[in-house]
Amino acid sequence: MIIMRSRLSLATAILMIGIGLAEPAWAEHFFFSTGNPDGLLGALSRRPSPGKIETETADDFALTETTVISQAVITGIIVPNTLPLASISQVEVELYHVFPLDSDTTRTIHVPTRVNSPADVEIDTATRDPLARTLSFSSTLLNPSFTVANSVVNGINASPNQLTHGEGPQSGEEVAITINFTTPIILPAGHYFFRPEVLVNGGDFLYLSAPRPIVPPGTPFPAGVTDLQAWIRNANLNPDWLRIGTDIIGIIPPATTAPTFNMTFSLAGDTVPDAGTPGQANCHGKTISALARQFRGIHSAALALGASSVNDLQDSVARFCNP
């Protein structure tokens, strides 16, 4: 579905209203946003395709309790800017723990550091893909021409050649991609990285940066949790990651420090305070019971959380309970 609008805030408002109408009064809504694009950077986020290697850009978020994530919005530019919105043909989402979880800490790394990076591998049960019918997406045009001051597209290199200072300005159509998780993502409290990828027929999607530290209308991180900078890798660098600002852009005079970036995204859903504990025998039954109580029935829960069916919600719970 292709939609034309002028501002990301409108898309986000509609997203929140749609969820809110389906929620009972006692359900606590979850919403996180890094805010609006700052025009400083566009970083490649690309599904693999013939002649083009996979490139992943990831930024972090935190949860203070078990949460069902139903929707996400990402903002970027399509290059070249002559492409129609229909050229956005595929979106995939992966989530990562923070290193050293899910990582081989005995191998020799080929980057300056892995501290505070995404893990080597994704949380397999949290991957969502339209080919697996676990997400759907729609695209909204925000600005027919948006320019970023710098970009990272091809210059993603192992140490000691990681410093490129970026690849210069890029212009393209600014778009918001709204992602609906038809199999919602359920996660326990924790610190995670969100990694979307986009396939653009005949072009690329450059994920737009947002201010770091977060400023309004973005939402702050929970007390005691550090907002980490964005990281990137391509298939050649995998399983390592590079810091986009510190490692790749670096210090560009007259600046005396390297920039750091957030990426422009938001997440929406609901907390489930009485959910079960992953790995425990009663996790599935306890979580389903908690959802049924919270939403006055499991069918209502599936509707409120954006699941395409009760079976898909059951699948979400099974993935959560058996990571």
Language-model segments: which ranges?
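Bacterial N-terminal signal peptides that target proteins for export
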Residues: I2-A11
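Bacterial N-terminal signal peptides
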Residues: A11-G20
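Boundary/junction segments of secreted and surface-exposed precursor proteins
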Residues: P24-P50, D270-L291
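Non-catalytic, beta-strand-enriched accessory regions in extracellular/secretory proteins
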Residues: P48-F61
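Aromatic- and Gly/Pro-enriched, solvent-exposed loop/edge beta-strand patches characteristic
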Residues: E54, I78, P84-T226
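Extended extracellular/luminal ectodomain segments enriched in beta-structured repeat modules
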Residues: T64-V73, A189
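PGST-rich, cysteine-poor low-complexity/disordered linker and tail segments that act as flexible spacers
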Residues: P213-T271
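Soluble extracellular-acting proteins and domains
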Residues: T271-P323
